[in-house]
Amino acid sequence: MEKFTRWRDPGTGIAPFHPINTETPSGFNFKWILIVVVMILRVPLCIISVTLWFLWSCFLKPILSIQPKLSFFIDSSLSRLLLLCFGCLKLSKSTSGSFVQGDSLQPGDILAVNHSSPLDVLVLSCLYNCTFAVCDSKTSNVSIISAQAYFWSCFFSPSKLKITDAKPLAKVAAKASKIGTVVILFPEGVCTNGRALCQFTPCFDSAKETDRIFPLYIKYLPPCVTLPVPSLLSFARSVLLTVSFEIRIRFSAEPLIPRNCTDVTESAQEVLSKLGRSRVVKLGKSDKLSYLDARSKKHV
């Protein structure tokens, strides 16, 4: 394990970038038969549902943009179908704290979400009418991206995801308010294995003082469907060898408002950490990029 020391958090000993392997049964037993049967059924269903999602996102959704409620219904239904085909048999959501008058989630609000799997995109698309935004570690500006583009970007190094037409978060939130969507931000900027929260990018620095930020934590059980190391084959293997998995969501009912926070980034990190009952490590996006670079050169 010495070769992993560089990418372990010195304070907690947690390695947030190391993949979690799928547990497979030893020897030949009934569970293997079940896995094979589920795999035979799941492969064609996944192919069909992904194809439908692709056709909808690329061709039909732009046409139905004039009917936002119908568009969201189809988006939500296809996302839920995909999750079901991938093996999600239970999706539960709980709320921490209680809403006060006027504090319920509204168009233009910002969701700060931990990032550990491509499935995060489907989970959020299933629950909310979303505008996804990409965070940059060098600037507080963010760039709008489609749900499908964000999903597929999880299978490539974060360095390949180019930040284009970046805008302050305040402008993105204002645009989302006009079109009736909420802004989805993954402030860590990278995928982890879900064992800890990484350092946040400075994306919240460009938020308006009156913008409302709602932390939301997504947890996968078992955690083998997380994807800290981008690989379509690894993800497919994990999904096919996992008979079923559960998704648990914890949502903070009390929004963070920048003007009420000494440091909104630190406050968001603290609340998200409490929601997920996870530690905050000192590693960040630059550490993830160096880890992937070393891994590609077979240094790990």
Swiss-Prot record:
A motif (HXXXXD motif) lies at residues 115-120. Its EC number is 2.3.1.51. It comes from the Eukaryota. Coiled coil: none annotated. One of its GO terms (molecular function) is 1-acylglycerol-3-phosphate O-acyltransferase activity. CDD domains: LPLAT (cd06551). The chain crosses the membrane at residues 32-52. It catalyses: a 1-acyl-sn-glycero-3-phosphate + an acyl-CoA = a 1,2-diacyl-sn-glycero-3-phosphate + CoA. Disulfide bonds: none annotated. Keywords: Acyltransferase, Endoplasmic reticulum, Golgi apparatus, Lipid droplet, Lipid metabolism, Membrane, Phospholipid metabolism, Transferase, Transmembrane, Transmembrane helix. GO terms for biological process: lipid storage; triglyceride biosynthetic process. Its main location: other. It is a single-pass membrane protein. It is an enzyme of class 2 (transferase). InterPro entries: Plipid/glycerol_acylTrfase (IPR002123). One of its GO terms (cellular component) is lipid droplet. It is found in: Lipid droplet; Endoplasmic reticulum membrane; Golgi apparatus membrane. Belongs to the 1-acyl-sn-glycerol-3-phosphate acyltransferase family. Acyl-CoA-dependent lysophosphatidic acid acyltransferase with preference for oleoyl-CoA. Involved in triacylglyceride homeostasis and lipid droplet formation. Involved in vacuolar protein sorting. This is Putative lysophosphatidic acid:oleoyl-CoA acyltransferase. It comes from Schizosaccharomyces pombe (strain 972 / ATCC 24843) (Fission yeast). The gene is vps66.
